[in-house]
Amino acid sequence: MRTRSRSTVRPLWPPPSPARFATWSHYRLRDHGDHTRPVDPRSAGTQVDDEVLEERVAYNLSKDAQLKEEARINVVAYNGKVLLIGQAPTMSASESAKNLAAGAEGVTEIYNEIRTGEKIGVGQISIDSWITTAIKSKLLANSEVKATEVKVITENGEVFLIGKLSPAQADAAAEVARNVRGVNKVIKVINYVQ
């Protein structure tokens, strides 16, 4: 059996050109001043609190056997507010998930966006991931909204924009999202600021 040496193995795709990195850096530096990495507008403590809150809600949801078996629910927390997205077999299962989430310590508000229906498959999950990436990339190039100020989540072609924005910024972010191929609906879960 003949083997190839490591030096002859080629990558699956060519690495990005240096011009792409220059463009990426241009957007990051323009959007974030001197920073060399994106900065979440929430404090580090709030980010940790939100991560802990997501775990608490997910734990509460895992206690329900029907939800665990038949539903696909993702939990997103932002400043103590919880967004539930995914699919559940019945409307009562969706309401049950909302009630379980409300029982988690630290929840200030719940947005229940769980849809009634079959769980989505790996193909749709991949498409949703692509949509989220495309929107985030376009937000980096947008001068009206900083990409770090809005969290983008896609579930079954529905895009959820989460963050603390002015009405004009929220509208600009929604317009960016609407113009990405594969987006069926844009839902703003925004804390409005002036």
UniProtKB/Swiss-Prot annotation:
InterPro entries: BON_dom, Lipoprotein_DolP, Transpt-assoc_nodulatn_dom_bac. Keywords: Cytolysis, Hemolysis, Periplasm, Repeat, Signal. GO terms for cellular component: periplasmic space. Its main location: periplasm. GO terms for biological process: killing of cells of another organism. Residues 1-19 form the signal peptide. Residues 49-118, 127-194 form the BON domain. Pfam families: BON. It is found in: Periplasm. Gene3D superfamilies: 3.30.1340.30. PANTHER family: BON DOMAIN-CONTAINING PROTEIN, OUTER MEMBRANE LIPOPROTEIN DOLP. This is 21 kDa hemolysin. It comes from Actinobacillus pleuropneumoniae (Haemophilus pleuropneumoniae). The gene is hly.
